[in-house]
Design a protein with these regions (language model features):
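Caspase-like (clan CD) cysteine peptidase catalytic core
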Residues: 4-31, 35-92, 161
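Short beta->alpha linker loops
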Residues: 1-2, 157
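Caspase-like cysteine protease fold
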Residues: 149-192
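Active-site/binding-pocket entry motifs
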Residues: 51, 122-123, 147
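Short, solvent-exposed loop/turn elements at domain surfaces
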Residues: 54, 117, 124-128, 151, ...
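Extracellular S/T/G-rich loop segment that most often corresponds to the catalytic His/Ser-adjacent loop
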Residues: 77-138
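Sec-exported extracytoplasmic/periplasmic mature domains
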Residues: 12-20, 70-74, 142, 146-150, ...
Length: 192
């Protein structure tokens, strides 16, 4: 169950045992809810059972998530976040009715060995492809990693190739309402 304590247990107990410091290339995939603080200073992963009025106490800030992973010392860490921080569900329901309609999260710098793919801009909703019952972002990440993103047909997929494929595909299927983002080195190999 993806509760706050379950996620923290995975980050603090399981992950350090699974990672060989400075040798492991870590891949993290999260699909679920996210929410920004009212001032846009912090973005939170909102696990099962979280109270949206008490984000600091019941959710996990993205910064803490990165710090916990950094403590395990992977050689590289690649993140795929199929969530949004707009405070809406995929059916456009508001998680917290009295929140402003649009909050833009202020991006924090990330370590050089991190590569972060997100489902959309911080004030956008991460939508679903109904016909496959997956988030648009997840679906096109999977298709991209299966080879669709290999633009130059060299049998390897760079972060830049994957991002371009996912961004164009999601943009097309969302009529431009969802724009996936990437932070990090676009020349780094995601799959080789």
């Amino acid at each position: 169950e993806a509760t706050r304590s379950g996620l923290l247990r995975a980050l603090k107990v399981w992950l350090p045992q699974a990672v060989q410091p400075d040798k492991t290339d870590l891949y993290v995939f999260y699909a679920g809810h996210g929410m920004a603080s009212d001032d846009g200073e912090s973005a939170y992963i909102v696990p099962y059972g979280a109270d949206t009025f008490l984000l600091e106490d019941t959710a996990i800030s993205r910064e803490r998530f990165y710090e916990e992973i950094g403590a395990a010392k992977p050689r590289t860490a690649t993140f795929f976040f199929d969530n949004c921080y707009a405070g809406t569900t995929r059916s456009e329901e508001r998680l917290l009715a009295q929140r402003p309609l649009s909050i833009r999260v202020q991006e924090s710098p990330v370590p050089d060995n991190y590569l972060i793919f997100t489902a959309g801009e911080s004030n956008q909703t991460a939508g679903v492809l109904d016909e496959v019952k997956h988030g648009r972002f997840s679906y096109f990440v999977f298709k991209g990693l299966e080879g669709e993103a290999d633009a130059n047909q060299d049998g390897k997929i760079s972060a830049g190739e994957l991002h371009q494929y996912v961004r164009e595909s999601v943009g097309r299927f969302s009529a431009g309402a969802q724009t996936p983002t990437m932070l990090g080195d676009g020349n780094r190999w995601v799959l080789k």
